[in-house]
């Protein structure tokens, strides 16, 4: 069972987005009484995966495994007729503007 943290509220996105993303991950692990060492990854609603490991290679391997499991789960839901969850404009804008906006601060520098 892969931990799945809730999505961020509009206020959480607009104030300390990165810290609040970490906060919902911690919140989910505490809520479920999970040991982060036993679960080397988590999904955050409307976000990519977060993974970790004893090395960078282990973290990448965990990310690949998590992505495959998520793909299988998504395909299963679609086959079953479940409706995919949309993304709110405030979150979509945050992801785009923090990387590509006038005041971009996240991602690789050119």
Predicted regions and their residues:
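Glycine-rich flexible loops
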Residues: 1-110
């Amino acid at each position: 069972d892969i931990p799945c943290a809730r999505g961020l509220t509009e206020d959480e996105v607009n104030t300390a987005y990165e810290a609040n993303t970490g906060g919902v991950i911690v919140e989910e692990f505490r809520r479920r009484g999970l040991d982060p060492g036993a679960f080397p990854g988590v999904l955050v609603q409307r976000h990519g995966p977060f993974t970790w490991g004893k090395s960078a290679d282990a973290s990448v391997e965990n990310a690949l495994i998590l992505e495959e499991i998520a793909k299988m789960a998504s395909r299963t839901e679609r086959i079953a007729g479940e409706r995919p969850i949309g993304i709110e404009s405030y979150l979509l804008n945050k992801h785009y503007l923090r990387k590509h906006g006038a005041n971009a601060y996240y991602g690789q520098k050119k």
